[in-house]
Amino acid sequence: MNHFFTGIMLIGLLSGSNNAIYQTGTASFYANKFEGRKTASGEIFRQDSLTAAHKSLPFGTKLKVTNLSNDSVVFVRVNDRIGNSSRVIDLSLKAAQKLNFVNKGLTKVTLEKI
């Protein structure tokens, strides 16, 4: 009987996780010319912050971004929009550095809402 309740609790904990993969696709990072400009949310863009642009997620959404080529991870906050693009996310330079893809320019990632 004790194992039954432990199993039920474990299933509840596992199924209650909101960190499911939201999206998979290509990531890039902002060019330096955007430093100091206003984002779509009204914030000033800074390359040294951990922020991102996404097509539709609400401003303030926090994401776990995983680089699929090297399994590195960064946590970012959405504060801007991507226009008509095949990319799923544009990252600040600091976020791209943490994911180790600056020299490549683009990388395949997964996005998880946190």
Task: Walk through the language-model features, giving the residues of each.
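Secreted/periplasmic proteins
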Residues: 2-114
